[in-house]
């Protein structure tokens, strides 16, 4: 009996240690904690299942200890509900959970990113010298795409993205060979139809914006490690319009 009590104490001690680690992790980086919450829960219950399995393998199955096992299980669930999920639970007994906190954090990050994108766009426009308007002339589509690409690079650098401008006709005639080779992206048929209708598409974290302002082009944005925002599509298209003012 004393051995059983000792094992229970050890189990509760381990639970307390894990709980303190979770608290430390939460206060150290709340945003990262919210992002990794589901992974933490899976790890938490995975450790519980493994520990119970190992215990049975070593000690054998003893149904007389069901009260102790029930208490241990209740403690594991309590830590999950009281700390990992709270206050993001909308329904417990129906096994339906609404991770409100994660959603709020996601919206908050999107709003902050959108505001930052707006400030970047405004800064680029303000730094353009109006005296340059109406002074440029592009004799070929290649010259135009290079000029537009150089203008859009400043926006791409500031948001940590890669922007490349392609001639639309050339890409359509080669089954998007240029885009596929540079971005390792396969464009589904339905997206090609949308591009033909002058509608922007997004394949994973790569956005493609059709623009027919001076010349028919596809503007490709690779967000890399940063998620693309809807504001990015709007800003890049508006910058393309702004770039057209340079034309004679």
UniProtKB/Swiss-Prot annotation:
Membrane topology: Multi-pass membrane protein
Segments traversing the membrane: 5-25, 46-66, 69-89
Cellular compartments annotated: Cell membrane
A biological process term (GO) from this entry: sporulation resulting in formation of a cellular spore
Keyword Transmembrane on entry: yes
Chief location: membrane
GO cellular component, one term: plasma membrane
Signal peptide as annotated in the record: none
Pfam families hit by this protein: SpoIISA_toxin
InterPro entries linked: SpoIISA_toxin
Keywords assigned: Cell membrane, Membrane, Sporulation, Toxin-antitoxin system, Transmembrane, Transmembrane helix
Entry annotated with the keyword Transmembrane: yes
Domain of life from the UniProt record: Bacteria
Known role: Toxic component of a type II toxin-antitoxin (TA) system. Upon expression in E.coli growth ceases.
Protein family: Belongs to the SpoIISA toxin family.
Subunit structure: Probably forms a complex with SpoIISB in which SpoIISB neutralizes the toxic activity.
Name of the protein in question: Stage II sporulation protein SA
């Amino acid at each position: 009996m004393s051995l059983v009590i000792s094992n229970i104490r050890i189990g509760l001690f381990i639970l307390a240690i894990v709980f303190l680690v979770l608290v430390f992790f939460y206060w150290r980086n709340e945003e990262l904690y919210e992002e990794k919450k589901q992974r933490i829960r899976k790890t938490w219950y995975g450790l519980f299942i493994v520990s119970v399995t190992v215990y049975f393998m070593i000690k054998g199955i003893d149904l007389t200890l069901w009260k102790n096992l029930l208490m241990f299980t209740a403690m594991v669930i309590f830590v999950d509900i009281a700390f990992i999920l709270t206050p993001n639970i909308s329904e417990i007994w129906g096994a339906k959970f609404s991770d409100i906190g994660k959603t709020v954090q996601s919206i908050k990050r999107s709003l902050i990113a959108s505001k930052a994108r707006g400030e970047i766009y405004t800064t680029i426009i303000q730094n353009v010298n109006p005296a340059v308007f109406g002074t440029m002339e592009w004799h070929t589509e290649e010259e135009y795409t290079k000029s537009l690409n150089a203008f859009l690079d400043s926006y791409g650098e500031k948001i940590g993205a890669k922007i490349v401008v392609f001639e639309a006709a050339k890409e359509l005639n080669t089954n998007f060979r240029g885009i596929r080779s540079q971005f390792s992206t396969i464009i589904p048929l339905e997206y090609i139809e949308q591009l033909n209708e002058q509608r922007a598409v997004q394949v994973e974290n790569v956005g493609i914006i059709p623009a027919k302002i001076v010349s028919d082009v596809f503007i490709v944005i690779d967000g890399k490690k940063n998620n693309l925002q809807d504001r990015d599509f709007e800003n890049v298209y508006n910058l393309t319009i702004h770039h057209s003012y340079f034309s004679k």
